[in-house]
């Protein structure tokens, strides 16, 4: 890791930990209907974070189930594409 990146991460560590804690406190249990509003709130939270991170286009796509969050940043349309996939929901304690 470059020294500039290391310094940046270290200087923002508390903020990152706070944001991650905020994220983890949202009970986004996707398999239980009673948490549907929380799953949507979590999608909104995630969309806000990726907007703040500089994504150009951020969209929350509703589905019959839980919403998708899709974001992109096109730096150079001729450059290779990098895809990052993850999930923001959690599973119940006793699946």
Residue ranges and their predicted role:
Residues 2-95:
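Acidic/His- and Gly-rich active-site-bordering loop/insert found
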């Amino acid at each position: 890791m470059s020294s500039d990146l290391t310094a940046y991460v270290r200087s923002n560590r508390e903020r990152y930990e706070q944001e991650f804690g905020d994220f983890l406190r949202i009970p986004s249990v996707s398999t239980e209907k009673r948490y549907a509003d929380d799953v949507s709130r979590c999608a909104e939270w995630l969309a806000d974070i990726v907007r703040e991170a500089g994504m150009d286009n951020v969209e929350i796509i509703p589905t019959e189930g839980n919403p998708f969050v899709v974001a992109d940043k096109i730096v150079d349309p001729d450059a290779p594409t990098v895809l990052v996939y993850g999930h923001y929901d959690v599973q119940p304690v006793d699946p």
